[in-house]
Amino acid sequence: MKRIFSVVVCAVGIFFSMTAESKDGCLKSYVSADSLLLYEYYESHIWVSPLNYTRVFSEQRAVAPDWFHYRDRVIELRVLALRKRIWDEYLRDFPLERLSVRVWLMFSLRTGELETVELMFRREVLEDTDSFPIREIIAMCMNSDWSGSTYIMEHKPDKYDNMYTGYIFPLY
């Protein structure tokens, strides 16, 4: 009886160790296989794509439940706070159309701090970016003086526009 018990314990231990080691690999394979994933996982960062984050895949929940808890408790609150502050301080005076600006955010998994911010504009908005406070918005998001380059990405309307609601500033 003792021998059977030890074999069962050993088998369970091997299963859980294999599961733990393959967790990152599984998540990465989901990222590469599906471009609509909410999160792209790296060694130390989590990339928050501007897709509708309420869309949850069962595979993601099974592989990485911790990331969803992290999203609900940390990322969502910070994003909502950033959206409100940017709108109040900068965007209220700019007559841009709805869905003209997309914001990409990267948070550190180790510290939970926001580390990268990218703004993406529609083509017609690029003509007015000289007066648009891009650097100020990025600096405010990063909570520091912005000394790096500002990247402006051109966006062409696509079939996923109606999904970009979670991390887009609704400009009215």
Question: What is each PLM-predicted segment?
Answer:
Residues M1-S29:
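Bacterial Sec-dependent N-terminal signal peptides
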